Curated annotation (Swiss-Prot):
Biased composition (Acidic residues): 68-79
Tissue: Atrium and ventricle, and to a lessex extent in brain.
Protein name as catalogued: Brain natriuretic peptide
Function (record text): Cardiac hormone which may function as a paracrine antifibrotic factor in the heart. Also plays a key role in cardiovascular homeostasis through natriuresis, diuresis, vasorelaxation, and inhibition of renin and aldosterone secretion.
Main localization, broad class: secreted
Similarity comment text for this entry: Belongs to the natriuretic peptide family.
Gene Ontology biological process terms in this record: blood vessel diameter maintenance; cGMP biosynthetic process; cGMP-mediated signaling; negative regulation of systemic arterial blood pressure; neuropeptide signaling pathway; receptor guanylyl cyclase signaling pathway
Cystine residue pairs: C123-C139
Length: 150
């Protein structure tokens, strides 16, 4: 009789420990929802604070902000190179400054390197010329892998 009660107590204790482990592994969903809501509001506050500091820095440098006229634009300033150096040091560049550094996509200078990647010697044709240049066959002469003896 005492043995059955003892095994029942051990079994019940084991069951309680297993439920405790499961409760700890999967916390209450209400607490998780509250934590995610708190994190979302904290993230929104952080984004707002960051935007305010960026706007304050841009106003200090005289850049265009929301509601400022175009005459006070930073493009009218003479120190555009200094501004680019400052912005790259800070870690962000305005879209206009990034577009100014890129070449014009419609000009021929932009597409020429892409078009001239395959050289055409005229011996066999474009495909065979490409194969021939790799295997030292064709009109190009020796291979780039062969060693010149002098």
């Amino acid at each position: 009789m005492l043995g059955s009660r003892l095994t029942f107590c051990y079994g019940f204790l084991h069951l309680l420990l297993q439920t405790h482990v499961l409760v700890c592994a999967y916390p209450n969903s209400d607490a998780v929802v509250r934590d995610t809501d708190t994190l979302k509001t904290l993230l929104q506050r952080l984004e707002e604070a960051y935007l305010l500091t960026v706007r304050a820095e841009s106003l200090e440098r005289g850049q265009v902000a929301d509601g400022m006229p175009e005459e006070q634009s930073y493009e009218a300033e003479d120190g555009s190179q200094e501004r680019l150096a400052e912005e790259s040091a800070i870690g962000y560049i305005t879209l206009d400054a990034e577009e100014a550094r890129l070449p014009d996509r419609n000009s021929n200078g932009f597409l020429n390197p892409l078009r001239n990647t395959k050289r055409y010697s005229g011996c066999f044709g474009r495909r065979l010329d490409r194969i021939g240049s790799m295997s030292a066959l064709g009109c190009n002469g020796g291979s780039r892998l062969s060693y010149k003896r002098s």
